[in-house]
């Protein structure tokens, strides 16, 4: 099952403070959306998403995969989704599942991301 690329997403209380912390660990900003209270940072081949006020909990986000196909295959293996696949107002498809410990696994793919992922097998150049 091809889930796409994965990114840890952290719910932060103070975006500026969190960015400063991660920059001290040699992360660099590759997606600067501070005006909307979120940012994407990179360290080597890892991307880290920081959100202030956009998500309720820390999660793993998979992007680029076929959300409906992931749902169908995972469901056939007995996994239950807490949010089945749906088309979001922004044009992306999303679904959500929890692991046995309650951790959120979020699948979210925009049409252009799917096409790019199919062509290159990646969404971010590291």
Please tell me what each predicted stretch does.
Residues 1-16, 58-60, 110-126:
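N-terminal beta-strand motif that seeds the catalytic metal site of vicinal oxygen chelate
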Residues 2, 9-47:
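Core segments of cupin and vicinal oxygen chelate
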Residues 2-5, 23, 54-57, 83-84:
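A short, structure-level motif marking secondary-structure boundaries and short turns
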Residues 13-15, 61-104, 109:
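Vicinal oxygen chelate
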Residues 33-34, 52, 118:
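Conserved catalytic-core motifs of eukaryotic protein kinase domains, centered on the activation segment
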Residues 34-37, 56, 88-93:
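Short acidic/glycine-enriched loop/turn segments that link adjacent beta-strands
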Residues 40-45, 52-53, 97-100, 110:
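Active-site beta-strand termini and strand-to-loop segments that position acidic
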Residues 47, 55-56, 67-69:
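Short, charged/polar surface micro-motifs in flexible loops or helix N-caps
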């Amino acid at each position: 099952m091809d889930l796409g690329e994965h990114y840890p997403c952290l719910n932060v209380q103070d975006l500026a403070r969190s960015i400063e912390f991660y920059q001290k660990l040699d992360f660099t900003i590759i997606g600067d959306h501070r005006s909307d209270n979120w940012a994407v940072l990179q360290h080597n081949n890892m991307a880290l998403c920081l959100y202030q006020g956009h998500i309720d909990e820390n999660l793993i986000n998979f992007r680029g995969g076929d959300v409906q196909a992931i749902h169908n295959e995972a469901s056939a293996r007995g996994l239950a989704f807490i949010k089945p696949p749906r088309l979001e107002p922004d044009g992306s498809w999303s679904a959500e599942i929890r692991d046995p410990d309650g951790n959120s696994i979020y699948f979210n793919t925009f049409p252009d991301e799917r096409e790019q992922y199919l062509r290159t097998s990646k969404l971010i150049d590291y």
